[in-house]
């Protein structure tokens, strides 16, 4: 009975009536005490490095790495469009963690200040995380974030902004340094044509051996912490001193990895000299982020540097990019390039067959890959994924260029409301008519969807793009605009064409704000901006037969619906976000096609009214009143239209004339059977 009284009270509750020296409870407490005491300050010196996003032929900016060290996380790389989708595929929790973000390009020459931060705003809006992130980036990126504060002002996730500087190193145009005394040191420089980031964890105390401590008679309680802190303690009986080296293992060596960026082969000499400066501790993991044209024999030779002998190399470059779609659960709705000859990158298929030529200890950086750095080793794990070869066979063609004199061709690029889902990107549509292309809204990821839809025909389509209509300034309708404009500008480098943008007045003010930090001076000079309110009474005449007008919608202030009118092929009406609108019905009467939002199912009508949206049956009523020849329902809430959704009232408007839109749908006016691009 005396022995049982010595057992901790909680052990008695669990029926652990063994003497304390051998009780299950005591042993577990001893083993876990060091781990869970002062959790915010512990350092296990084990680094988990995972790939949040990797480079794909249709991804404009990548990659993004997540480094986990105990209860801290560090995001390194670029947060390009649809980063929020990538975060959703990660099991990691960023809520209660201390997070530092380093947005950095491979070099200053390749800096696309908008591109590396375009996905940040959507993530801030949709994450729901209540935390503060320390964000470190070049000054133009910080300036863009500050000037786009309206995009995330209501987010519970706050940003502590820190600009890179050149004060510490006169040779570096941008440099950064972060020291967290208990955990790690991060430093780097971004030069004109290359960059580096080094990540060093701190040496950690050795592992406390609970079994040895029990055997030597270490008193249960604070004595464990004293031994770990380097102090000697007396045994239980008070007769013997017990020293740290008796119960604490040797210190755990610091872990060390590197990120190297390169945009010019002329930088290899400087990079080699930099590697020569490595001291006695060499990195075990090196991430290489390369611009197009860098990967090849010269760079492979650089990988054989003597101080890389212990390192595992991970290469991110378009030449080795995988064929995975952004929306991996929606493979049937994505058109993937069999040859990957995207106009955006101008790559020949023959240059892509290099994965079999990778040197030893060299791997392609992929989202399925994660690395664990521990005990000066880099261990690689790769989760199973679908076969790119099978996908390439399945998606062997792109949409052809729309023919002239065949009426309207509508390509549905995105159909989701508010946030992208695994099956739907954000609102965006492309209309082709008589050799002219018009885009309706540009949600985040619009240009990637455009690439995916037209592939090798992307550049010819962009050369035909004459106008973009932005219905209103909710971010899910215009955050992809800048990347669309930059792609258009690149496709039209050798001509003097202008592009018309119709939208709310504040849209142009925002673009003007970003002119300097995003380097948009030349692009904005090619834009003719028309305030949407003006086209209510004065349509924009694109050709003698084709015009665009607008109708105020019932949604938020300064929001509009769009009507494209052709003298021969009739009207194509796009509702944008709105409640059923009698003015739109009158303006669009007899439309060849009505593209109408259908955010909520009928049983959520009360919410549709509250949020100024429409239900499916309300959209049918608009089509019936308008006498539209065809109706496409789009802009679906994430909570609606699952396998068991409530169908609308088909007595209002014929089901045979109605289509539920999916990303990748192509509607052609004079085809009896509409074709989905699968």
Swiss-Prot record:
EC number: 3.1.26.11
Transit peptide: 1-37
Cofactor names: Zn(2+)
Subcellular location: Mitochondrion; Cytoplasm
Alphabetic keyword roster: Cytoplasm, Endonuclease, Hydrolase, Metal-binding, Mitochondrion, Nuclease, Transit peptide, tRNA processing, Zinc
One GO CC term, this protein: mitochondrion
GO biological process: mitochondrial polycistronic RNA processing; mitochondrial tRNA 3'-end processing; tRNA 3'-end processing
Chief location of this protein within or outside the cell: mitochondrion
Highest taxon, organism lineage: Eukaryota
Reactions listed under catalytic activity: Endonucleolytic cleavage of RNA, removing extra 3' nucleotides from tRNA precursor, generating 3' termini of tRNAs. A 3'-hydroxy group is left at the tRNA terminus and a 5'-phosphoryl group is left at the trailer molecule
Gene Ontology molecular-function annotations: 3'-tRNA processing endoribonuclease activity; metal ion binding
Function recorded in the entry: Zinc phosphodiesterase, which displays some tRNA 3'-processing endonuclease activity. May be involved in tRNA maturation, by removing a 3'-trailer from precursor tRNA.
Family the UniProt entry places it in: Belongs to the RNase Z family.
Name of this chain's protein: Ribonuclease Z 2, mitochondrial
Record organism: Schizosaccharomyces pombe (strain 972 / ATCC 24843)
